Amino acid sequence: MSLLTNYEGLRHQIERLVRENEELKKLVRLIRENHELKSAIKTQAGGLGISGFTSGLGEATAGLSSRQNNGVFLPPSPAVANERVLEEVGIMALAPLAEMLTSLQPSATPGSLMSPLTGTLSTLLSGPAPTSQSSPLTSFLTSPIAGPLTGTLASSLGLPSTGTLTPSSLVAGPVAMSQSSPLIAPVMGTVAVSLSSPLLSSTATPPGVSQNLLANPMSNLVLPEAPRLRLAEPLRGGPTGPQSPACVVPTATTKVPLSTEPPQSTQDPEPLSMAFAGAPLQTSTPIGAMGTPAPKTAFSFNTSDTQAQPSAAQEQVVPASVPTSPTTSPTVTVLASAPALAPQVATSYTPSSTTHIAQGAPHPPSRMHNSPTQNLPVPHCPPHNAHSPPRTSSSPASVNDSRGPRTTEPSTKSMMEVERKLAHRKTSKFPENPRESKQLAWERLVGEIAFQLDRRILSSIFPERVRLYGFTVSNIPEKIIQASLNPSDHKLDEKLCQRLTQRYVSVMNRLQSLGYNGRVHPALTEQLVNAYGILRERPELAASEGGPYTVDFLQRVVVETVHPGMLADALLLLSCLSQLAHDDGKPMFIW
């Protein structure tokens, strides 16, 4: 009798489970319809340019379909929280039934009373063993909705979460997240970062967001992008050393003749510039031409003072093979070469080109010279003929192919002062070609427009930061996350994060109304800066035509300078800069 009673009770439980299963399936259909409806609404809202910000606690990512075109998310509706509560309650209600069915299964006999649902539920709810997808409840629990259910159940029971944090997992409960993430590990207590936040989206990114963000955005926070720097900034106070190729500004230089004769310097109409493709020079006492060849160095050198004295005739002669370390003095120590070295160096004079010094075959070790060379001062004698033939040298010297024993580092301040003095003397003694000077100045104005636009966008979002090293328009979302972290406990300051994000969205909405595309124009600004350079002195000092820069004047500069294929985008950048300057009431060029 007791066995029949148990069977009867079990049959009622199974029937109740079947009814609950039907109700759960209806709930799943409603949830799916709700998700599809929200996805459609978000897609339409993204097409209309509607933006918002969400920083909800425990928000789960809804997949690619929930992202808007501009990468900004709408806040979740209250129905989402109710759905999670229902899902959690449904799983908690099935747990005791699974335990009872597991305990009764060995003593039960096969019959019509034992529905296949019992075994399925017992297997499904008793452990992580793989189950068949044919059961309706199994398919429900293994559907995309089941991802948050598992994490929610573990969190509600107070169990520690040992799995890694992925974009599809739900951050809920006290601490239910992976401790291996560099950003999420400090986020404790009630603070939980939503992985569907617009700051971490990877596919439909907001305007200005880099397109190479990975699917797991946590790993992208430690991948800084190459910053854009002014060429003169390392001379103001930064450490000296090899310059990055990203900072090289294309300039016009002079082919420097290299021979055994002290040449009279050739006149170069281009302004002073120095762009290193390798490493700087090293000043040392020559030991002689060694048999071991030094590394090849290719650099462009442009002098601003073009006269030379007989005692200082070797100023512009550059060694064919020089050690790569910083110099000591403002001027470059030049070593006269042996006659065999003359064919190894390009000596033709070609304006607007770079001087490539190639190292030829090394001299035999037996040829050793001990004649000292001196560090030559900047010449101050009257100018000579710009293209007169070189005269014969009377002091032999040798090429230093190895590192000298004495090296010191230059003072960045003295280097910058010498550079300014040389540029001033050149403009006063040797007037440049007006047409070439105007073209070079206008090209730098175009690059300055692009640079100032990026600087204005960044300063609008991070006004409290004086230095923006490493900040670009493309990595603004990552920098917002970094700026929102508390340096003491590394917790996310949600209020600060929301305030910075609102500034970012506001600036991008203003620029989008002018035609600015956050996925196209940040890269274009970098291209313009690298192609045309930037101003090398304060804008008020570099202003031409008797007054400050105006929009009309800058439009004429852009039209006459930029290639026709990029002209429309360059004019758009100028209009965006003018609009931002009008909004904050500051000059267009902020130094």
Curated annotation (Swiss-Prot):
Pfam families: Speriolin_C, Speriolin_N. This is Speriolin. Residues 1-78 are annotated as: Necessary for targeting centrosomes. One of its GO terms (cellular component) is centrosome. Detected only in testis. Signal peptide: none annotated. It comes from Homo sapiens (Human). Residues 317-331 have a biased composition (Low complexity). The lineage of its organism: Eukaryota, Metazoa, Chordata, Craniata, Vertebrata.
